[in-house]
Regions:
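Sec-dependent N-terminal signal peptides of Gram-positive bacterial secreted proteins and lipoproteins
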Residues: 4-25
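A cross-domain feature marking catalytic cores of carbohydrate-active enzymes
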Residues: 21, 188, 219, 295-297
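Metal-dependent phosphoesterase/phosphodiesterase active-site architecture
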Residues: 30-81, 87, 91, 106-109, ...
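Divalent metal-dependent phosphoesterase catalytic cores across multiple superfamilies
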Residues: 42-218, 224-249, 277-281, 309-324, ...
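Conserved beta strand-loop-helix elements of the APE1-like EEP
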Residues: 115-119, 220, 357, 415-418
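Residue-level signal for short, function-critical loop segments
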Residues: 156, 221, 266, 297
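Active-site acidic short loop of glycosyltransferases
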Residues: 180, 212, 287-288, 332
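Generic beta-sheet signal
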Residues: 184, 215, 289-295
C-alpha cells in the first residue's frame, strides 16, 4: 500500500509540474523431473555474541577474475578481519581494503573489498573481529574464458520466515540443478518492507546459500523506495559510477565473454537521464560478445504493475538505449510472473533485437494476468512465453488460459554461455509434487522441478567494438541538474502517452474488474 501511495503521489506531482510548466511557457511565449533437496547436516549450535557476524554475503565488485566485495553485520562496533584460504585450506595473503565500520539501523556494517585473487580458483573465507569468526563460506573467481554458468532469480519479497524458507528452497534447488553456477543475479525485492526484522529472517533462511556463492544484486522498489540506504548497506558493490546510491546502485561487470550492466529503476521513480547516459556509455565501452542488462521494473508485462507509467516509461526510454547499443538480453522482475518477449527492436519484433525476460518470482507472492492490459499496455503478439505461477496458466501462442498444475510454484532461471551460444532455461519448483502414480500430493522433501521455458541465442563472436573510452562518472551537480528534465520526461510520457492509453483501456478495465471478478 505504501509503494502504491508513493507511485500515485509521484504521478500527481508529475502532472502538476507539467501543467505548471506549460502555463509558464504559455505566459512567457517442458518435462518434469524430481530433484533431491540439498541436505544440510545440523551443526552444533554456536554461541552468539554482539561480535558474531551475520548478514554475510559476497558480491561482484570490480574485476571478477581477481576481486570480491564482502559485507557483514555485527551488534557491536568491532574490528573487521577477513581471512582467505585456497582450495587446500592454506591461508593466502591478498590485499583487503577495509571500509570504516559504521552504524546503520542499530547494527554495525563491515565492508571489505578483496583483490589480488587468482583467476578461475575456488576460495574459502571467514569474517570476524580477529578472535571470533563466522562459519567459512566460499566463492569462485572468473577464469576469463568464454564459458560461464549462473543463476537468475527475482522477488523473494517475503515478510515471514515460512515464506523466506519457501524461496530459499527454490534457490537451493536452482544450485542443485546447476551445480556449476558461479554466481547468482537477484533482480530485486529481497524483502517486503526492508526492516531489520525482515532482513534478519532473509538471512536466517538464505545464509547457507549466500555463504557459498557470489551475488550480483539489483535494487527493487521494496529495497529502495522510501527505505533509503538499505540496498547499498546490504551489499558491498562498486559504486564508483553509480549516479546516486540513496535507493539503489547502478554498476556493471564482465564475466567470461559477457558484459552485464545493473540498472536502478528506483532512480527518480523510473530512470534518470543521467542513468540512461551511463548505460549507453557503459554498453559502448565493452567489446565483450554478450551484452546483458538487469533491472527490477519491467517494460513488458501483463502483471498488476503493467498499468502504471513508471515501468511502462522504460519501454520508451530504456529500450531506446538497448536498441542503440545492440544489447542481447534484458532481465527484470517486479511483476511476479514469467514473461519472455520475441526479440524486440524499435518496439517491433525483430530477429536482431533484444530478448526481454520478466524472470518470475522465487517467492510465494505471485501475480496473475491483468486481462485489461492486453492491446493497450502490452501487445500479445510480442509474447514468446508466459507462465503465471499463482494459477499455473501458460501461453500457447494464442492464449494464456491453459493450465499446468506443476507450474504453481517458485521460479529460478539458469544461463549457460559458451562462446557464441547463450542457453536460458527457466524452471518451476512446484508447491506440490507427484507420487509414483503421477498423482499430485503435498510438497515434500524432493521438490518437483519442471522446465517450463527454454531458449537459445546464438551469434558470431568478436563483432562488438569499443566506441566509448571516456569518463562515465556522474557528479552530484550533473545529476541534480539533470533531475528536473528527467522528471519532466516521465511526466510528459504520463500525460502524452500513458494517460490516453488509460482512458482507452477504461472500458476493458471496468468489465474485467467489476463484471469478471478480475484483479486491479
Amino acid at each position: 500500500m505504501k509503494k502504491t501511495f508513493i507511485r500515485i503521489l509521484s504521478i500527481i506531482l508529475c502532472l502538476t509540474l507539467v501543467s505548471g510548466g506549460a502555463a509558464f511557457s504559455s505566459a512567457a511565449s517442458l518435462p518434469a523431473t524430481n530433484t533431491d533437496a540439498v541436505a544440510t547436516p545440523d551443526a552444533p549450535e554456536a554461541v552468539v555474541t554482539d561480535a558474531t557476524p551475520f548478514r554475510i554475503s559476497v558480491a561482484v565488485n570490480g574485476d571478477t577474475t581477481s576481486s570480491k566485495g564482502i559485507i557483514w553485520y555485527t551488534k557491536a562496533n568491532t574490528a573487521s578481519v577477513v581471512n582467505i584460504y585456497d582450495e587446500n585450506g592454506a591461508k593466502v595473503n591478498v590485499p583487503v581494503d577495509y571500509a570504516d565500520v559504521f552504524e546503520f539501523e542499530g547494527n554495525y556494517v563491515h565492508k571489505a573489498t578483496v583483490t589480488g585473487l587468482a583467476a578461475g580458483k575456488t576460495y574459502s573465507y571467514e569474517v570476524g573481529n580477529g578472535t571470533e569468526f563466522s562459519a567459512k563460506g566460499s566463492f569462485v573467481t572468473d577464469n576469463g574464458d568464454a564459458k560461464s554458468e549462473f543463476l537468475v532469480i527475482a522477488d523473494i519479497q517475503a515478510s515471514n520466515l515460512k515464506n523466506f524458507q519457501s524461496a530459499a528452497r527454490v534457490v537451493e534447488t536452482g544450485f542443485n540443478t546447476m551445480p556449476g553456477a558461479e554466481f547468482m543475479i537477484t533482480l530485486g525485492d529481497f524483502t517486503n518492507d526492508s526492516t531489520n526484522e525482515e532482513w534478519d529472517l532473509y538471512d536466517e533462511a538464505m545464509k547457507n546459500i549466500n555463504l557459498k556463492t557470489t551475488i550480483a544484486p539489483v535494487a527493487g522498489n521494496h529495497d529502495g523506495l522510501g527505505v533509503w540506504d538499505w540496498f547499498n548497506n546490504m551489499f558491498n558493490l562498486d559504486t564508483s559510477e553509480s549516479v546516486q546510491n540513496l535507493n539503489g546502485v547502478n554498476y556493471s561487470f564482465d564475466y567470461g565473454n559477457a558484459h552485464i550492466a545493473v540498472v536502478n529503476t528506483n532512480d527518480l521513480l523510473s530512470i534518470s537521464f543521467a542513468q540512461l547516459t551511463w548505460l549507453k556509455n557503459d554498453m559502448n565501452s565493452t567489446d565483450k560478445d554478450w551484452k546483458i542488462v538487469c533491472m527490477h521494473k519491467s517494460p513488458y508485462t501483463l502483471g498488476k504493475d503493467g498499468k502504471w507509467p513508471d515501468a511502462l516509461y522504460l519501454k520508451r526510454s530504456l529500450t531506446a538505449v538497448v536498441d542503440m547499443c545492440d544489447v542481447d538480453l534484458v532481465m527484470s522482475g517486479h511483476d511476479h510472473q514469467y514473461l519472455r518477449t520475441q526479440p524486440m527492436k524499435y518496439g517491433m519484433v525483430n530477429e536482431d533485437g533484444a530478448t526481454y525476460v520478466l524472470a518470475g518470482t522465487a517467492g510465494t507472492k505471485r501475480y496473475g494476468v491483468r486481462n485489461f492490459l492486453e492491446g493497450y499496455m502490452m501487445n500479445t503478439k510480442h509474447i514468446a512465453a508466459l507462465t503465471t505461477q499463482n494459477n499455473g496458466h501458460y501461453w500457447d501462442g494464442e492464449t494464456h488460459e491453459n493450465e499446468n498444475e506443476l507450474y504453481k510454484g517458485g521460479i529460478f532461471n539458469t544461463i549457460a554461455i559458451d562462446g557464441g551460444k547463450l542457453s536460458f532455461n527457466s524452471y518451476v519448483v512446484s508447491d506440490r509434487a507427484e507420487d509414483e502414480e503421477g498423482n499430485i500430493i503435498d510438497m515434500n522433501e524432493a521438490p518437483t522441478v519442471t522446465l517450463h521455458d527454454t531458449f537459445t541465442l546464438e551469434k558470431e563472436v568478436g563483432q562488438n567494438e569499443i566506441t566509448f573510452t571516456g569518463d562515465n562518472t556522474t557528479s552530484e551537480a550533473e545529476y541534480y541538474l539533470g533531475a528536473i528534465p528527467s522528471f519532466f520526461g516521465l511526466a510528459a510520457y504520463t500525460l502524452g502517452e500513458w494517460l490516453p492509453r488509460v482512458f482507452a483501456m477504461l472500458p476493458a478495465l471496468l468489465v474485467d474488474v467489476v463484471f469478471m471478478d478480475g484483479s486491479f
